[in-house]
Amino acid sequence: MKTHDNRVLFSKALLKAATCLFLTAGAGMSPVFALPGTAESMKMEITQQTVTVSGVVKDKKGEPIIGANIMEKGTTNGTITDFDGKYTLKVKSAQSVLTISYIGYKTQEIPVGNGGKKDITLQDDSELMDEVVVIGYGTQRKGDVTSAVASVKAEDFTAGKIGDAAELIKGKVAGLTIAKGSGDPNAESTIRLRGVISLQGGSTPLVLVDGIEGGLGTVSPENIASIDVLKDASAAAIYGTRGANGVILITTKNGQRESRTAANYSGYMSLSKFGKTLDFYGAEEIRQGLTNYVDKGYDTDWLDAVSRTAFTHNHNFNISGGSKNTTYSADFTYRKEEGVLLETYNEEMRMRFDVSHWMLNDMLKVNFNMVKTFHKNGPIDAAGLGIYRQAIMRNPTEPIWNEDGTFYENFAVNYYYNPVGIIREQDGKYNSENTRMTGNITFEPIKNWQTNLMLSRRVTSDHNRGYYTSEYFSQKSENHTGYAYHSQNEYTTDNLEVTSKYNHTWNKHRFDALVGYNYQYNVNEGFGANNYDYPTDFYLWNNLGLGTALKDGKAGMSSYKNDNPLIGFFGRVSYGYDNKYNVLLSVRREGSSKFGENNKWATFPSVSLGWTISNEKFMEGLTWLNNLKLRAGYGVTGVIVGDSYNSLTRYEYGSPYFYDNGVWHQGLSVKSNPNPDLKWETSKEFNIGLDWAVLDERLSGSIDVYQKKTSDMLYDFTVPTPPNLYNKTLANAGKMRNQGIEIAVNAIPVRTKDFEWKTTVTASHNANKLLSLSNDLYETSNQIDHAYLGEPISLSTQRMEVGRSMGQFYGMKSVGVSENGLWMVENTKTGEIEEFTDNMLSNDDYRQYLGNALPKLYLGWNNSFRYKNFDLSFQMTGQFGFKILNEPRAYYENNSIAYNRLKSVQKAPYGGQYTLSTAQKQTFVSYYLEDGDFLKMTNITLGYNIPLKSSKFVKNIRAYVSADNLFCITGYDGLDPEMSNGDIWSLGIDWRDKYPSTRSFTFGLNVSF
């Protein structure tokens, strides 16, 4: 297929603004320096008689076109127009011909002649004015799309300090929630599309990078050309069991045919600090006797002792180009991100190479792509080890070190450890390596019929090792010496895919068909070992057998291997008539070894319709209306179970051990019951949408309304033993419903030669409801308490109940404090207010629903401004109508504890007369639930395109400064009201152990050569 058939096209209204942003981002369409191997040929060309031609490229309105390609036909000699549409090019001779092209306009050719000034006016190409979006196994003209699909191009990505690809589109796609909720440099974004649909299955959308399944962290953000989101089931059903949570399609940048070699560098440096810290007592308040602490005479800022101003630097270099028959691209990225907490970091090096070659008069195309990533991070799991918690609750009058240089500890207090010692008395290396190789062979024997064979292998290897010294708190408190561990894991996915597609247009008809086969084979294997009580800390993890725990049978050793194949047959037919009526049908038949013997296979169909009302004759008089299209779709998708052998009886050999007559023996125990009827969760979704554009597409948008029902939901049911071998069985029984509305509005309020303002607003609402938890065979209570807090509270904070949504807080409603300093709690049965007693904790007479953790409204607001060489963009996100459990307040806003306290403990709750006394134990009451509403300045970026004189090497430089998480408008008292909500069993809980979110300031540079 010719190169121009595959171009990503822009809508007319966004064309010039997108180009401005494209150029300011330093994306490479600029001329390149001469490669070393071409030096001799350049000398020869210079000796020939050359002609210089210059001029201005404009559109039909007389406005300059920025970034238009000016090429000397038949060569790689060329340039692009500047911000005034001007160009200058030296060509070989007067017989040369210039080819002028730009996306959205007809390509023109003009003879050079004697050179001089040649102004050019490009004409609109109406066939190119409709943007192309990526759908499953192909692309589609936006005007023909009948499903809920959102597309974000590179020029609209969020700039600044970007951790993974999800952050590029945060707040830009209605219904897609992206949150990190953590400052951990190794944390990935949590993504959820259209609510919670499963109790046991995953909630993250399927991510495909150039058609290959992968994670958002497996691709460099700088290398992404577009991100397309398949939101409804009619679009995602062609991916079957993997598409129930939606599909995110990432397309990377590649070289173009007959284009000059272009090179680009982009890099940034960033400084980060905690976005907010909690206000605890300092040493002076301790000396005033406001806690039970003994004054040790020091003044220690524990949080400062374990934190720093974190430095991040990121560098990306890419090169791309192409000849008549070959394209190539390569890029290299290095990134090191420090965490604000000491010894937390993320260091990564990623390389990518892609080459394509056409032969036999474009009948055959061969492509090879390789991605290699090396990742390294430290051994500190700051959240898991409670470093932040230990720092905020520790006595500020205690020292960090003893006089002998060891870390000061006070083991008389439970769960109380020196956070600096936790960091310094351990060492380790966590390395991972990811390799992805993909090959494609595309055969096009006749025009418009393509058959493609794709082979891919993805291998991820993790190699982790670590050591706790004899002074580490867990070893020291239990009278053990050093502890060492070592593990290696490898995850391999082999993928074979064959697709054949055909498209044809005649008269007013359009027809597209696709059939395909996919085979995916996954293998996971690894081993791990640990030992402790070492005579010396010298060897670290390098001599595992030296620890004496091995001789006592207390050392650990394990290995595992599991595999599973996934097979799919799929097809799709799309038909359109007269650019008015469109229909799309798809089906996938899929089989997996993960399911029971009776349900290995399932079928996932979909249908969607589109009616472009604005193209009807009766709409011809409405010149202000550019587009009005009604869409409707229905589809079935599935959720696949995580473990390979859940449908089988599984035995655990080696645990537990038992000791008999001086010898350790391995035991054998049952790990799971068989279930031959185990099958896919099934999600059925109906979506109706409306796309519109007015005023020459200066104002456009979409609205979608949907309802999604999940049936045969997986749940671990308690079963009797005997007759069962194990007390739990994974089975299909539950039902859940999600329904909502999504709105997106795009506008260009101002557009002149020197100034442009673009703005986008997204809004979404989703309502979740659990419909059932049982069936005729498996039954459980319609009310299940969960989301337990840790020691010493140890209470559930939420209740899952049929007929209600997930994330329902459930507990005691407090209304004040008694004169005895105890909570006053509402009795739900009598309505009376009673003083707190321990008997209330498990008595439903004193517990009630207190609010929900799932926001009712999600907002995103994105703005970009361009004034001459300056550009400014900012992004705001918000969530409204939900509750947050402030766990740090529940623990440290209390006068009975043996730890440090929040200063707010001095404030009388509910504006009353009394504060909590030392008699009131830590517990969960409604006082610790807060409104979570917020509006956050997620990112703001100011950029400047540096004017350059004509240069042989550097064509464009853009510098920018950026701030992330700059401020948050909220009434919430905790660190950050933006919850990651990755675990549906603990929604809306602001954990005391979490890694606090950070605020970052960035300076970046983009250079095109």
Regions inferred by a protein language model and the residue ranges of each:
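Transmembrane beta-strand segments that form the barrel wall of outer-membrane beta-barrel proteins
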Residues: 265-267, 332-336, 583-592, 634, ...
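Short, small/polar-rich motifs associated with maturation and membrane association
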Residues: 1-353, 358-359, 364-367, 371-373, ...
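Residues on the lipid-exposed face of transmembrane beta-strands in outer-membrane beta-barrel proteins
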Residues: 252, 282, 317-321, 351-357, ...
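Extended, hydrophobic alpha-helical segments in both membrane/secreted and soluble proteins
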Residues: 224, 351-353, 567-573, 581-591, ...
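Glycine-rich, aromatic-lined ligand/substrate-binding cores of catalytic
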Residues: 852-885
